[in-house]
Amino acid sequence: MTHSWLLLTVLGCSAAMADSNNQALIDNAGKQYTGVLSVNQAAGNQHQQINSRAISLGGQASDALIQKLDGKVDPSLNASAAIQGSAFSNGNGILGVNQSAGANNQMINAVRISTGPQSVDDNVLSQQNMTLLPDSRSPSTTGSRQVVTSDQAFTGSRGVVQVNQSAGVGNRMANTLGVTIK
């Protein structure tokens, strides 16, 4: 019985692959998701990605997300990120997608839901990023960057959809949503 479940799991997987050539590709993955779906995909070096969910009944939902990154990278690298086909279409719930290609990219998707009064403070999302060339005397060059999202991706989805998609060096992105029900 275990082997049949394993086979079903392997056959039911969709493509969400990244390679060492700084190319991230999600193709037709996550269709008809229900509930909470969190996807972090990175191709390249030194990426930080968070999908955070905090739910509180009768109290205060909070999360503190801190990312710090210090590394040497070459900004001339080529990078591409793509979400293709009908990926994440016709879903229902909370979806968080972080997709990056390149180096030293930071991404956060955060959702806080609570009952009762609550203040929303964006200071809890603290990010620091330093990107340095290995040799500061080298001439500055820029590589090719490409980000693609299919016009069929995410169609028909309901609920919360948070997407960060980047190709390059030293990008910082955050999507935050705070909901209080009184």
UniProtKB/Swiss-Prot annotation:
GO terms for biological process: cell adhesion. The keyword Signal applies. FapB_R repeats lie at residues 22-58, 80-114, 150-180. Keywords: Amyloid, Cell adhesion, Fimbrium, Repeat, Secreted, Signal. Residues 1-18 form the signal peptide. Disruption phenotype: Deletion of just fapB in an overexpressing strain yields cells without amyloid fibrils. Deletion of the entire fapA-fapF six-gene locus shows no visible growth phenotype. GO terms for cellular component: extracellular region; pilus. Its main location: other. The keyword Repeat applies. It is found in: Fimbrium; Secreted. Transmembrane segments: none annotated. Forms fibrils in vitro; in the presence of FapA the fibrils are slightly narrower. A minor component of purified amyloid fibrils. Fibrils are resistant to boiling in 2% (weight/vol) SDS and require >90% (vol/vol) formic acid to dissolve. Belongs to the FapB/FapC family. A minor component of the functional amyloid in this bacterium. Probably nucleates fibril formation; FapB nucleates fibrillation its own, FapA inhibits FapB fibril elongation. Upon overexpression of the endogenous six-gene locus (fapA-fapF) in situ, cells form large clumps during liquid growth, make large amounts of biofilm and produce amyloid fibrils. Expression of the 6 gene operon in E.coli strain BL21(DE3) induces flocculation and biofilm formation with copious extracellular fibrils. This is Functional amyloid subunit FapB.
